[in-house]
Amino acid sequence: MWFLILFLALSLGGIDAAPPVQSRIVGGFKCEKNSQPWHVAVYRYTQYLCGGVLLDPNWVLTAAHCYDDNYKVWLGKNNLFKDEPSAQHRFVSKAIPHPGFNMSLMRKHIRFLEYDYSNDLMLLRLSKPADITDTVKPITLPTEEPKLGSTCLASGWGSITPTKFQFTDDLYCVNLKLLPNEDCAKAHIEKVTDAMLCAGEMDGGKDTCKGDSGGPLICDGVLQGITSWGHTPCGEPDMPGVYTKLNKFTSWIKDTMAKNP
């Protein structure tokens, strides 16, 4: 599981270690500069942890399995290791994972039949509002179901190979097809529910993985999913990835934001 490998990497690595084996886009391409202004880099201390999505000046949405402590975020980044004057740094004042996510699964490093990774969402409240600019912009939540067969864009930082973990400093994008959930249910022993989306290429070669977790899945121009879990090595044939289906959670997201002004 992607996030189990992420947890092990963080457990074994030091705070100031190089970025762990976690995030990657397989079979993708370098995103056009500033084309994903809502994409957020979530850090634990100085170590890249996960992706995220800016929903409004005060709130970032990411995956619950990215839960940790001492967060900070970078907004408007294209390259994680270059000084970019347009980028913004913020600390996180509060992390609110979805109450339905089973946190105990983060500590289990083996796969079991019918494990349920539902509700893999977490809201991060920024200590200071983001400044909305050409390079830092929020993205709205979906109002309708995504259509099967849609072309979806996922993005993230990290290795661009499925097994050698050759990291890229730049934000990478990949086009994925929205597939029937039955395809993911056949591929994985874990539970696939109607609160999840299935996306990838059945022929293999294109995928998201590990610390790409928490990043956006944008289908036909609309934010529809958050990268959650899948098979390792990533990009294998008949092994599409699984994403949290956001239109099932818009009420929880909006209510949580309203209750924590």
Swiss-Prot record:
Pfam family membership, one: Trypsin
Domain Peptidase S1: 25-258
Enzyme class name: hydrolase
Cofactor note: Binds 2 Zn(2+) ions per 7S complex. The Zn(2+) ions are bound at the alpha-gamma interfaces.
Pro-sequence residue ranges: 19-24
Catalytic activity: Preferential cleavage of Arg-|-Xaa bonds in small molecule substrates. Highly selective action to release kallidin (lysyl-bradykinin) from kininogen involves hydrolysis of Met-|-Xaa or Leu-|-Xaa
Molecular function as annotated in GO: growth factor activity; metal ion binding; serine-type endopeptidase activity
SMART domains: Tryp_SPc (SM00020)
Cofactor(s) required for function per UniProt: Zn(2+)
Additional note from the record: This precursor is cleaved into segments to produce the active form of the gamma chain, which occurs naturally as combinations of either two or three segments held together by disulfide bonds: B1 and A, or B1, C and B2.
Family: Belongs to the peptidase S1 family. Kallikrein subfamily.
Protein's name according to its UniProt entry: Kallikrein 1-related peptidase b3
Organism: Mus musculus (Mouse)
Name of the coding gene: Klk1b3
